[in-house]
């Protein structure tokens, strides 16, 4: 099975769907919103081509479910808020928003929500139906999606940790895994494994910046939010807990060790410094803003029961990783993996050690020399 076929969230609206298990991401989006507003404010000051008539925006790696339109709502509200501040300087423009993700993404679950979303925009923002146009642009964000110099603003949240492929060099010539007992590049991984993952991330992120800089107008903006490394040595991110759960099944004899050793997630969690260095080395963008922050897995969860919280966290992580796990380990063992995941989560949550570190970075495309 091709990797792109399983790099998706759980679709539909069932109990294990991403639509029902993505409340954590809403907390991250709330943290991003003030930065988004400032990014839009700077964008509208830049006097880009045709921006007074139609602002062209894309959400790269939009996923599915209500969070997709929550991002769209935040973008529209930010544009309208800044436009109201400018009053006569800027008439309310049409907004054209492209939702991007891989072809297997459940776009239909988003499209079903559009009629009510448009009505809500009209009621709350005064935006008449037709003044905000939302469509899909399926495909990998590591490849060209739009014509040259056609976009004003690109947004992406919680996507850049996904690599275009599993790094090469994780298996020796004799077929032995160099990442035995692990499913990604963690702090405990061997240096060759860490290097292989960093090299793949550097290649992919450089490609991402180069391709999308070509799609943006000069002075166009890009706002990226991704998971990043923290300084806490004893913290446990969700992939660490997932790795521990799978290892439990190996120890208990429910899963062959070779099955674990042959599995590596196409995921890399960079440091803020690595992201910054790659942006500077690629050279197409100026860094306007960079911030790191952490959000506990159970933040915003009101029920004060560690086991219920742990099940909630397990369901959230399952909605993200089940398709790729099921393609390798089989669907039958998925409930067992996340039952053990919840047990590990219940141990770290009371200690405040279960969280994601996050990075927000705001970028502006540098002008061509001929534009200066």
From Swiss-Prot:
Q: Name one GO biological process term.
A: methylation
| Top-level enzyme category | transferase
Amino acids binding xanthosine: 21, 25, 158, 161-162, 316, 321, 356
Q: In which tissues is it expressed?
A: Mainly expressed in leaves and fruits (grains). Also present, at lower levels, in roots, stamens and pistils.
Highest rank taxon of the organism: Eukaryota
Q: Hey, where's the site called Involved in substrate discrimination on this chain?
A: 155, 267, 331
- Documented EC number(s): 2.1.1.158
Binding residues annotated for Mg(2+), in chain numbering: 179, 261, 263-264
Q: What does this protein do?
A: Involved in the biosynthesis of caffeine. Specific for xanthosine. Cannot use xanthosine 5'-monophosphate (XMP) as substrate. Directly produces 7-methylxanthine, and therefore the methyl transfer and nucleoside cleavage may be coupled. Catalyzes the 7-N-methylation of xanthosine, but does not have 1-N- or 3-N-methylation activity.
Q: Which family does it belong to?
A: Belongs to the methyltransferase superfamily. Type-7 methyltransferase family.
Relate the assembly described in the record. Answer: Homodimer.
Name this polypeptide is given: 7-methylxanthosine synthase 1
| Organism in which the protein naturally occurs | Coffea canephora (Robusta coffee)
Gene field? XMT1
């Amino acid at each position: 099975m091709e990797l792109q076929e399983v790099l998706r969230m759980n679709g539909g609206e069932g109990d294990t769907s991403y639509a029902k298990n993505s409340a954590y991401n809403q907390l991250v989006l709330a943290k991003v919103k003030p930065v988004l507003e400032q990014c839009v404010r700077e964008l509208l000051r830049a006097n880009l081509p045709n921006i007074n008539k139609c602002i062209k925006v894309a959400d790269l790696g939009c996923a599915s479910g209500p969070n997709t339109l929550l991002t769209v709502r935040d973008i529209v509200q930010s544009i309208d808020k800044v436009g109201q501040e400018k009053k006569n300087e800027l008439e309310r423009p049409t907004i054209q928003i492209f939702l991007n993700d891989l072809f297997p993404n459940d776009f239909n679950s988003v499209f079903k929500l559009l009629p009510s979303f448009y009505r809500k925009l009209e009621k709350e923002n005064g935006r008449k139906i037709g003044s905000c146009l939302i469509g899909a642009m399926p495909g990998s964000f590591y490849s060209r999606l739009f014509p040259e110099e056609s976009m004003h603003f690109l947004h992406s949240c919680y996507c850049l940790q996904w690599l275009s492929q599993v790094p090469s060099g994780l298996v020796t010539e004799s077929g032995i895994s160099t990442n035995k007992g692990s499913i990604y590049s963690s702090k405990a991984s061997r240096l060759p494994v860490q290097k292989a993952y960093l090299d793949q991330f550097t290649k992919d992120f450089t490609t991402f910046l180069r391709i999308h800089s070509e799609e943006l107008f000069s002075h166009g903006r890009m706002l990226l939010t991704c998971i990043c490394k923290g300084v806490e040595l004893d913290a446990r991110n969700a992939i660490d807990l997932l790795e521990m759960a799978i290892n439990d099944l190996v120890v208990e004899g429910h899963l062959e060790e070779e099955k674990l050793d042959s599995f590596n997630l196409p995921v890399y969690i960079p440091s803020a410094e690595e992201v910054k260095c790659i942006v500077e080395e690629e050279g197409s963008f100026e860094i306007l803003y960079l911030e790191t922050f952490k959000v506990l897995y159970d933040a915003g969860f009101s029920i004060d029961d560690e086991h219920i919280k742990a099940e909630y966290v397990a369901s959230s992580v399952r909605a993200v990783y089940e398709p790729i796990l099921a393609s390798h380990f089989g669907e039958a063992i998925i409930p067992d993996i996340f039952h053990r995941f919840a047990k590990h989560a219940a141990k770290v949550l009371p200690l405040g050690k279960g969280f994601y570190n996050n990075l927000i970075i705001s970028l502006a495309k540098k002008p061509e020399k001929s534009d200066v």
